[in-house]
């Protein structure tokens, strides 16, 4: 059943089968009961029998996609070793529908297979063995959900080994994609990563620009992760611009796509959710892609299926040719090349290679580097663009590209650095990093193919520029091929910077071919670039190339084909080839009037016929030889003239155009390429004429488009183009008038030989360009033309009338010399008469076959006086004019002609009035004969105007003449008067009819006076308003006629139902309703009495007519009629008139000036005498023409030019052209200045500058950070060097065995800025020969002040420690005191004052005996602070310790004081004891001190609350101090109480520590830093002066406790820029689990006092590097070096380095952090250790 009925049958049966299948579940027959099976079986058989032909037809018509593409599915289950529930393909075993797993086979069919389970697991899953091909079941359209509007994308599921030619056919044929001009393949990381905001913006903008300008395809991975997500964001940001323009194709593995089941279906539209499941390993597709190719290899959740398919597809696309179009092959021998009419040779535009491919690398993993190597090794190699700064692989490639040398070599030091970077970036082992490094170096061997884009670099400001530059470098093509590639991309910036460079070699003709391609593809910038680089348009443009440009199908749509069809007056075949002859006819049709195109002139048509005619049978018809000849008798003469035309076909210039920019501009205008037309307007000569011609052509095409019912947008666009060119003409005229008035007037009047021998004024009138005519320059010229050679400015009308009525008064008038009017126009005939005596005859124009003998016989009148050139009197500018010349010039002035004609016309009207008002006699009277002669001579004048008009053909002359409104009315009036005159000469009753016609005819002649009023400045605009209102009233009359007839017909039919057929019915319909409009309502006839007889008052009875049926309706409809007609429509007409008035009023001045030109031209061409005397002027003109014909040969002048123009020599013409070009340059210069000074442009420039400054500031900040990082690296290396030197010194000391007292003669001046962590550790505590060190640890409360303690960069907790040392000090009670040095705020050292200071101020509270004073020592310059710690021999018992001072180890307690004397020997006794007799020292454990009293350091805080545990950190650590091996400090003599040691503070560091307290069982996280780093004996520096007066020291009681943190610039730098140090915890001692009793504490105190040894302060040194308790030190990183330097400079000027700085923190914040921390969360503990 073929045909449409078969289709209906198929569809109908399909619906039935579908219903039955769903109703009875035909697919599940096996699941049905036995009772239902027979019915189902019967239905199935019936459906099968009915559908068998339809199913076969369906299979035959199977879609091409199903036949060409396949999918892959796993058909063998091999469990994975990692997950036994999954197959090696990635799917669950249960998802293998309909398959028998291998394990099941072994379990259920043991007889068939005896393999073990291990054998099955050892079998490797492979795509070729364990997958099966089947036709694809997923293709169609995706509708992405979840956005504001759903995006759509085409998709298809294909096998991973699909042939690339099938995919390309799918994209170009099925998906209707145009072959790309560039393929951008984006590679990068698949994991999500963040780009810098600025880099992301530049990346997205550049990628979109590269794709939009070149018509590129973008290949990505398709999924919404990693770099693909950033590509999608870029497409999303430009969605409004790029919709339908950018083709983004995602090639993704089918197995990793989320929601695969939603995409299954054949040629379907599937909604797709873009929300990804965070628990799933699959990913969703990116919604901003336009197409998806899903590669299927049978796996699920695994990448890699698309790699091979994507690379093969890119390779195949790169082999495709781009931009191939049908171009004729043109030979230089134009007589032999015209073979393109029969066949067309294909000449591809652009390179002879395929589609260029470029790889774009953004971020990425190690596999991306392998992909880059594969691209570089391909044949031909694919250029790669690397986006530096995006991270990982991109940065490594950029680094290798920057520092590698030719051949892939790199410096050894950089090689190690790069290997370390690879290890850290990809978490690789050394071996893996080396392998990847080898791949990287292989890539660097072809580094010329790699382009690195660095944001902000001078070479690559945009990434699109980097992409295209890389393609040019990698293409390895010739210069013409590179230019064609840039032309296809439309990237003139690439061509200018990369192709047109110095030293580039260009083959002959290559640039001309590029010019042709640029013109066809409408690439204005390339045309400009080619012209700048030496392409000669004169040599380039030939007849054949111009014709090819008119026949191109590229570029914007245009109406040229429709115009040619209108001109040819017939349908054209689809493959019709437009010739230049057709173009000439179209131009003449659009320009209208008498315009004559060069393409239709005899010379060009003969040349065209000789070149192309023999190869073209219809050449003669196209040339128009037969059609254009007006008279039959002239054909023989015309053909003879054709043979006489001398054309040298061997001349190479014969095929070129003298003004190529003219021809190209007209081509651009007709092809609707506005930008190209504007460009060609700027080049070449006669710019003003070109602008006016373009204005007229666009306006005419817009009119044609609106007449042909085309889309309104086309007409509006063409009108807009016309206004643009018109504005250019006016602005150029204004510019030239400002520079030189006379040359500007010459521009308006000189003859344009290339534009139908017209003038700019004539072209402006033809284009109806009112603004151009109304310009001051044009009006001044018209005024001079109007006055002729008369010099009159005031009362010109009265003077002219007086001269006409009294001719002797002419001699008193002033006249202008010829030199005063160098720009004055004249007729061609007069010009030739002036040239005859001076030079031999020269044919100025070619002859044309359309010259009419009648025109030659009539000739023309002298439109203007003959101004013969008098060489002898040129120097005398104001010479006297002869009387005869004055009379002649007077009567030939247009103003005189106007008044002469006006006076004659007024006399004619007076005589006409007399004729129609008086009795008409049998024969005409004298007055009547005068009127008849006036009309008759006026008719002859009208015939002369027609015959002497500019068009060549008689029919065209008539058409042009009838376009004038007054000419049409004059013709009607003359014909009507002629009819009346004929009837008047007849007998009665025709004589009366003639008289009536006279009476009617005079109405028009009165109206004709309005044309005369038009010359007046005030009356002229009103005349035009009347004309406009008349047109509006015509539309109103049509509407009024509808209303009037509706009422009139109804009224007439109701009131007069029994009328007979008559013409009176028409009159009766309109008569009364029409007069009702003006207020005559005929009240007596509205409701006349009718019906019964009426009795008057006098008793008489009046018989009334019977009432008409329905007569009562007439008043009702009359009321409605009057309401609509009198009120609504009349007021509507008034409103329309009002609108017209204001519309015309706004342009009335321009309209009047435009009409003034027409009036001036009319009287300029008229003879001197008015009708009826004009007959004498006609006779004179005939006589002159006959005489001229005798003196000239017939062939000398083929065309008669009757226009008024300025004829100038070639030198003057060149001068005018130069002046015009200067004006154009000045015009564009001023235009650019105005544009640059406009507010919008200034705002834009300012915005760009601010953005650039912002980018520069960002770059400066980045460089500053880079410099800081470099300085930090230098600091670290210097610290390491110092550490190395220290260790070397220690080693040398051990080797030489020198004593420290002899070797350490110089005090160390180590700066606190040392960044070596190990060195700082060694400088972290006191060290004495037999001394003890005590460290107090303080936990850092995060809620405390952040500016005091440095922030550790690690996640480890932090801890402070303070160093203590003990000296053998005895008071009166024999108590040994422990001296403590601790930190207040930032390393300020404070203790109580000495006892001497207490004595000086008795009112002050008591202070501890031990003092710590800080004094500057000018004799020993140091960048740090010298700290003097004093220990007094005596301690008065009457001085009680302060509550707010620190008592270490409970020294202030009575129990401790009582125990101390009995256990501790005195100082002198101790000194006399032998070492063996001294009390043994032991370490004090934590348990021994838990019961000691701990007091606050700060007066701002009271004692700790009882509920708060005093130890919130680790217990104080114990470190054994051994003899330092460093020789940097002096070894002191045994302990002397009279001398105080000097302590120097340096820096601190962190060390991580975690521990548990046995006392509390609470884990405490701590971090440690140390503060005291140096201590020397004061005997080296005159100790007596150092401790002269304790009260004068800053630490005295009489002084305020000073905070030295503000005067320590190095410490401030460390606090303001936190350092990051880390240490490992030291080994802790064993802690007791239970708290000790008070008795045990008392015993411990007693034991402690007995075991306190007198230390000998030798030096403050570091822990030895070999000590087991030394924490491991990591490198410290400083964040600000400049701030440290600045602070050093600021503090260098302070006289007292210990005074508080103004910039320090306010005192209101309280005491130091150390005090407050200890008061809240810390306590002291001490340890004792004796150095062996």
Curated annotation (Swiss-Prot):
Residue ranges, annotated region (Calmodulin-binding): 192-215, 300-323, 601-624, 793-816
Ranges where the record places region Disordered: 829-851, 1610-1732
TM region positions: 895-918, 926-948, 965-985, 990-1013, 1029-1056, 1112-1137
UniProt note: phenotype after gene disruption: Trpm3-deficient mice exhibit clear deficits in their avoidance to noxious heat. Trpm3-deficient mice display reduced hypersensitivity to thermal, but not to mechanical, stimuli in carrageen-induced inflammatory pain. In the chronic constriction injury (CCI) model of neuropathic pain, intraperitoneal injection of isosakuranetin or primidone do not reduced heat sensitivity in Trpm3-deficient mice.
Bias type Polar residues, positions: 1635-1653, 1690-1701
Cytoplasmic side: 1-894, 949-964, 1014-1028, 1138-1732
Membrane topology per record: Multi-pass membrane protein
Segments of this protein annotated with the region Required for the inhibitory action of G-beta/gamma-subunits of heterotrimeric G-proteins: 617-625
GO CC, alphabetical: plasma membrane
Molecular-function annotations in GO: calcium channel activity; calmodulin binding; G-protein beta/gamma-subunit complex binding; monoatomic cation channel activity; phosphatidylinositol-4,5-bisphosphate binding; temperature-gated ion channel activity; zinc ion transmembrane transporter activity
Keyword Signal: no
Intramembrane segments: 1074-1101
Compositional bias ranges of the Basic and acidic residues kind: 831-847
Predominant localisation class: membrane
Extracellular side: 919-925, 986-989, 1057-1073, 1102-1111
Binding site for 1,2-dioctanoyl-sn-glycero-3-phospho-(1D-myo-inositol-4,5-bisphosphate): 796, 1017-1018
The keyword Transmembrane is assigned to this record: yes
Localization (cell): Cell membrane
Family the entry assigns: Belongs to the transient receptor (TC 1.A.4) family. LTrpC subfamily. TRPM3 sub-subfamily.
PANTHER family xref list: TRANSIENT RECEPTOR POTENTIAL CATION CHANNEL SUBFAMILY M MEMBER 3, TRANSIENT RECEPTOR POTENTIAL CATION CHANNEL, SUBFAMILY M, MEMBER 6
Protein name per UniProt: Transient receptor potential cation channel subfamily M member 3
Gene of this entry: Trpm3
């Amino acid at each position: 059943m073929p045909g449409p009925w078969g289709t209906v049958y198929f569809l109908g049966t399909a619906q039935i089968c579908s219903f039955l299948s769903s109703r009875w579940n035909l697919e599940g027959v096996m699941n049905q009961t036995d009772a239902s099976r027979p019915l189902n079986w019967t239905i199935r058989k019936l459906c099968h029998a009915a559908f068998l032909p339809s199913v076969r037809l369906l299979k035959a018509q199977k879609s091409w996609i199903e036949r060409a593409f396949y999918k892959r599915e796993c058909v063998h289950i091999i469990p994975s070793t990692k997950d036994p529930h999954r197959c090696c393909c990635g799917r669950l075993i249960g998802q293998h529908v309909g398959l028998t797993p291998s394990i099941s086979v072994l379990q259920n069919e043991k007889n068939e297979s005896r393999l073990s389970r291990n054998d099955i697991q050892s079998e490797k899953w492979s795509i070729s063995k364990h997958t099966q091909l089947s036709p694809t079941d997923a293709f169609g359209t995706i509708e992405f959900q979840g956005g504001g509007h759903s995006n759509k994308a085409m998709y298809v599921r294909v096998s991973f080994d699909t042939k690339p030619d099938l995919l390309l056919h799918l994209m170009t044929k099925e998906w209707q994609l145009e072959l790309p001009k560039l393929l951008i393949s984006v590679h990068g990381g698949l994991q999500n990563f963040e780009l810098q905001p600025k880099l992301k913006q530049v990346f997205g903008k550049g990628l979109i620009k590269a794709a939009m300008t070149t018509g590129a395809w973008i290949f990505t991975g398709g999924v919404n992760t990693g770099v693909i997500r950033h590509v999608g964001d870029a497409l999303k940001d430009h969605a409004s611009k790029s919709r339908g323009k950018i083709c983004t194709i995602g090639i993704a593995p089918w197995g990793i796509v989320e929601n695969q089941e939603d995409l299954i279906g054949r040629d379907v539209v599937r909604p797709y959710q873009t929300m990804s499941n965070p628990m799933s390993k699959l990913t969703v597709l990116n919604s901003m892609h336009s197409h998806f190719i899903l590669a299927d290899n049978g796996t699920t959740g695994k990448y890699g299926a698309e790699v091979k398919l994507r690379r093969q597809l890119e390779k195949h696309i790169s082999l495709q040719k781009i931009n191939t179009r049908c171009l004729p092959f043109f030979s230089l021998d134009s007589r032999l090349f015209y073979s393109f009419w029969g066949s067309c040779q294909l000449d591809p535009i652009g390179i002879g290679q395929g589609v260029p491919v470029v790889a774009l690398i953004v971020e990425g993993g190690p596999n991306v580097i392998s992909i880059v190597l594969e691209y570089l090794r391909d044949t031909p190699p694919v250029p790669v663009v690397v986006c530096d700064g995006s991270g990982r692989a991109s940065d490594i490639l950029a680094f290798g590209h920057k520092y590698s040398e030719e051949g892939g070599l790199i410096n050894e030091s950089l090689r190690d650095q790069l290997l370390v970077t690879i290890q850290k970036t990809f978490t690789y082992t050394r071996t893996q990093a080396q392998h990847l490094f080898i791949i990287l170096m292989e890539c660097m061997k072809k580094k010329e193919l790699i382009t690195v884009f660095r944001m902000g670099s001078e070479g690559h400001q945009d990434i699109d520029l980097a992409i295209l530059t890389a393609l040019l470098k990698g293409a390895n093509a010739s210069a013409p091929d590179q230019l064609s590639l840039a032309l296809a991309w439309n990237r003139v910036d690439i061509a200018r910077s990369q192709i047109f460079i110095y030293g580039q070699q260009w083959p002959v003709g290559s640039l001309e071919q590029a010019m042709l391609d640029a013109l066809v593809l409408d690439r204005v910038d390339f045309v400009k670039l080619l012209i700048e680089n030496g392409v000669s348009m004169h040599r380039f443009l030939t007849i054949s190339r111009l014709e090819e440009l008119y026949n191109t199908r590229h570029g914007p749509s245009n109406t040229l084909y429709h115009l040619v069809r209108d001109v040819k007056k017939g349908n054209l075949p689809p493959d019709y080839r437009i010739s230049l002859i057709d173009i000439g006819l179209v131009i003449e049709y659009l320009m209208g009037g008498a315009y004559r195109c060069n393409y239709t002139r005899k010379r060009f048509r003969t040349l065209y016929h000789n070149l192309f005619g023999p190869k073209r049978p219809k050449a003669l018809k196209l040339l128009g030889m037969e059609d254009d000849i007006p008279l039959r008798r002239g054909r023989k003469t015309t053909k003879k003239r054709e043979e006489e035309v001398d054309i040298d076909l061997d001349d190479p210039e014969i095929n070129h155009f003298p003004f190529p920019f003219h021809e190209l501009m007209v081509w651009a205008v007709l092809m609707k390429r506005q930008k190209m037309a504007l460009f060609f307007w700027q080049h070449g000569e006669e710019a003003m004429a070109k602008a006016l011609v373009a204005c007229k052509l666009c306006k005419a095409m817009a009119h044609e488009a609106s007449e042909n019912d085309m889309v309104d947008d086309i007409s509006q666009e063409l009108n807009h183009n016309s206004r643009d060119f018109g504005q250019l003409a006016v602005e150029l005229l204004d510019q030239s008038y400002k520079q030189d008035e006379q040359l500007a007037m010459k521009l308006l009047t000189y003859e344009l030989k290339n534009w139908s021998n017209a003038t700019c004024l004539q072209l402006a009138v033809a284009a109806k360009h009112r603004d151009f005519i109304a310009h001051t320059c044009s009006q001044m010229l018209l005024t001079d033309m109007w006055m002729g050679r008369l010099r009159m400015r005031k009362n010109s009308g009265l003077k002219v009338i007086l001269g006409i009525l009294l001719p002797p008064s002419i001699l008193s008038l002033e006249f202008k010399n010829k030199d005063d009017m160098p720009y004055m126009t004249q007729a061609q005939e007069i010009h030739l008469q002036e040239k005859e005596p001076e030079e031999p005859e020269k044919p100025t124009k070619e002859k044309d076959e359309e010259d009419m003998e009648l025109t030659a016989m009539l000739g023309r009148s002298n439109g203007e006086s003959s101004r013969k050139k008098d060489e002898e009197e040129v120097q005398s500018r104001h010479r006297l004019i002869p009387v005869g010349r004055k009379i002649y010039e007077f009567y030939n002035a247009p103003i005189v002609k106007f008044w002469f004609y006006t006076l004659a016309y007024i006399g004619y009207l007076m005589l006409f009035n007399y004729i129609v008002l008086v009795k008409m006699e049998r024969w005409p009277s004298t007055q009547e004969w005068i009127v008849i002669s006036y009309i008759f001579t006026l008719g002859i004048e009208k015939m002369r105007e027609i015959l002497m008009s500019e068009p060549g053909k008689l029919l065209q002359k008539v058409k042009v003449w009838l376009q004038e409104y007054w000419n049409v009315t004059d013709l009607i009036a003359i014909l009507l008067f002629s009819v009346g005159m004929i009837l008047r000469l007849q007998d009665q009753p025709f004589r009366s009819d003639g008289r009536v016609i006279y009476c009617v005819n005079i109405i028009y002649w009165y109206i004709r006076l309005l044309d005369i009023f038009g010359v007046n400045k005030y009356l002229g605009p009103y005349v035009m308003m009347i004309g406009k209102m008349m047109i509006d009233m015509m539309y109103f009359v049509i509407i009024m006629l509808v209303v009037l007839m509706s009422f009139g017909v109804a009224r007439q039919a109701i009131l007069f139902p029994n009328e007979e057929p008559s013409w009176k019915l028409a009159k009766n319909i309109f008569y009364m309703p029409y007069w009702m409009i003006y207020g005559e309502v005929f009240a007596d006839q509205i409701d006349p009495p009718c019906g019964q007889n009426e009795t008057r008052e006098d008793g008489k009875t009046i018989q009334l007519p019977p009432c008409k049926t329905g007569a009562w309706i007439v008043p009702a409809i009359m009321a409605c009629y009057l309401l609509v007609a009198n009120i609504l429509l009349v007021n509507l007409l008034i409103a329309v008139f009002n609108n017209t008035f204001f519309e015309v009023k706004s342009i009335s001045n321009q309209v009047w000036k435009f009409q003034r030109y027409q009036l001036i031209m009319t009287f300029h061409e008229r003879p001197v005498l008015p009708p009826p005397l004009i007959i004498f002027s006609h006779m004179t003109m005939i006589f002159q023409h006959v005489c001229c014909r005798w003196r000239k040969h017939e062939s000398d002048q083929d065309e008669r030019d009757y226009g008024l123009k300025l004829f100038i020599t070639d030198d003057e013409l060149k001068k005018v052209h130069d002046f015009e070009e200067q004006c154009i340059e000045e015009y564009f210069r001023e235009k650019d200045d105005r544009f640059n000074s406009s507010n919008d442009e200034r705002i834009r420039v300012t915005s760009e500058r601010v953005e650039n400054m912002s980018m520069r500031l960002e770059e400066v900040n980045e460089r500053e950070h880079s410099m800081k990082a470099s300085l930090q690296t230098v600091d670290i290396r210097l610290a390491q060097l110092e550490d190395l030197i220290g260790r070397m010194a220690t080693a040398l000391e051990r080797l030489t065995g020198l004593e420290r007292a002899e070797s350490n003669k110089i005090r160390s001046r180590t700066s606190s800025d040392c960044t070596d962590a190990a060195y700082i550790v060694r400088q972290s505590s006191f060290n004495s020969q037999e001394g003890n060190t005590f460290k107090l640890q303080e936990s850092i409360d995060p809620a405390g002040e952040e500016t005091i303690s440095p922030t550790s960069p690690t996640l480890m907790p932090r801890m402070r420690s303070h160093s203590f040392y003990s000296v053998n000090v005895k008071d009166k009670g024999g108590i040994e005191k422990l001296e403590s040095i601790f930190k207040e705020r930032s390393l300020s050292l404070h203790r109580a004052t000495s006892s001497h200071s207490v004595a000086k101020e008795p009112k002050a509270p008591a202070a501890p005996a031990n003092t710590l004073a800080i004094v500057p020592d000018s004799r020993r310059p140091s960048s740090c602070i010298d700290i003097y710690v004093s220990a007094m021999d005596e301690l008065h018992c009457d001085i009680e310790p302060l509550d707010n001072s620190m008592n270490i180890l409970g020294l202030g307690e009575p129990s401790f004081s009582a125990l101390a004397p009995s256990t501790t020997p005195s100082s002198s006794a101790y000194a006399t004891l032998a070492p063996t007799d001294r009390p043994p020292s032991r370490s004090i454990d934590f348990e021994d001190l838990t019961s000691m009293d701990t007091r606050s350091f700060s007066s701002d805080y009271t004692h700790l609350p009882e509920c708060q545990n005093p130890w919130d950190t680790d217990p104080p650590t114990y470190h054994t101090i051994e003899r330092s091996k460093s020789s940097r400090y002096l070894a002191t003599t045994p302990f002397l109480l009279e001398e105080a040691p000097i302590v120097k503070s340096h820096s601190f560091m962190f060390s991580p520590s975690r521990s548990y307290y046995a006392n509390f069982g609470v884990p405490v996280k701590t971090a440690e830093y140390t503060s005291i780093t140096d201590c020397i004996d004061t005997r080296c520096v005159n100790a007596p002066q150092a401790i002269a007066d304790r009260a004068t020291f800053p630490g005295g009681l009489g002084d305020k406790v000073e905070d030295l943190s503000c005067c320590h610039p190095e410490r401030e730098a460390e606090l303001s820029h936190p350092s990051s140090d880390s240490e490992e915890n030291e080994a802790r001692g064993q802690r007791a689990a239970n708290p000790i009793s008070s008795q045990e504490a008392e015993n411990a105190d007693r034991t402690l006092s007995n075991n306190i040894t007198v230390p000998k302060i030798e030096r403050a040194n570091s822990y030895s590097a070999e000590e087991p308790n030394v924490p491991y030190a990591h490198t410290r990183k400083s964040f600000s070096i400049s701030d440290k330097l600045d602070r050093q400079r600021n503090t260098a000027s302070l006289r007292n380095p210990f005074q508080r700085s103004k910039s320090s923190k306010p005192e209101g914040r309280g005491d130091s952090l150390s005090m407050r921390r200890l008061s809240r969360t810390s306590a002291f503990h001490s340890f004792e250790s004796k150095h062996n």
